[in-house]
Amino acid sequence: MTIKSDKWIRRMAASHNMIEPFAPDQVRVSEDGRKIVSYGTSSYGYDIRCADEFKIFTNINSTIVDPKNFDEKSFVDFKGDVCIIPPNSFALARTVEYFRIPRSVLTVCLGKSTYARCGIIVNVTPFEPEWEGHVTLEFSNTTPLPAKIYANEGVAQVLFFESDEICETSYADRGGKYQGQHGVTLPKT
């Protein structure tokens, strides 16, 4: 597998709608002139943005977290430009971008250092061959203080790896449960 460059990312976004909406270069300043956490195409990856839809974890209903039988009451829905994650808690969000991953490609996503240096960890599982949808983002606040997440700004970087051989069965072929997801998607079994 080889990592793909900015040229390949731009070409695939233009010819295959791999990323929509797409920023062909790094964006570091908002349209109104404010400094922001960067997003867009980088040398060997794409910095994704967080949309303004969040699900903030709460223990108000005193449920047990069970990935096989997840209780939606474990989250409080929030929409806004800034999400405050309580100390030692987490939140879910989704990307602004919608992805269509080619059959020969697998991605790995890593949190941006701007957030990591503040104790905020971004977790995203790989985007598998022929998966498509908005990406559900997991933010963990590892600090004893409330932490801010900024909507419509960069939060993580996606690295694209292309195999020298096409996979036998893609995510779409096996009817993956998160195929075509829109919005913040909770666990499914």
Curated annotation (Swiss-Prot):
Pathway given in the UniProt record: Pyrimidine metabolism; dUMP biosynthesis; dUMP from dCTP (dUTP route): step 1/2
Highest taxon of the lineage: Bacteria
Keywords, ordered alphabetically: Hydrolase, Nucleotide metabolism, Nucleotide-binding
GO molecular function ontology, one term from the record: dCTP deaminase activity
Enzyme's top EC category: hydrolase
BP GO annotations: dUMP biosynthetic process; dUTP biosynthetic process; nucleobase-containing small molecule interconversion
EC number(s) on file: 3.5.4.13
The UniProt record lists the keyword S-adenosyl-L-methionine: no
Subunit structure: Homotrimer.
Function: Catalyzes the deamination of dCTP to dUTP.
Membership in a protein family: Belongs to the dCTP deaminase family.
Protein known as: dCTP deaminase
Upper lineage: Bacteria, Pseudomonadati, Pseudomonadota, Betaproteobacteria, Burkholderiales
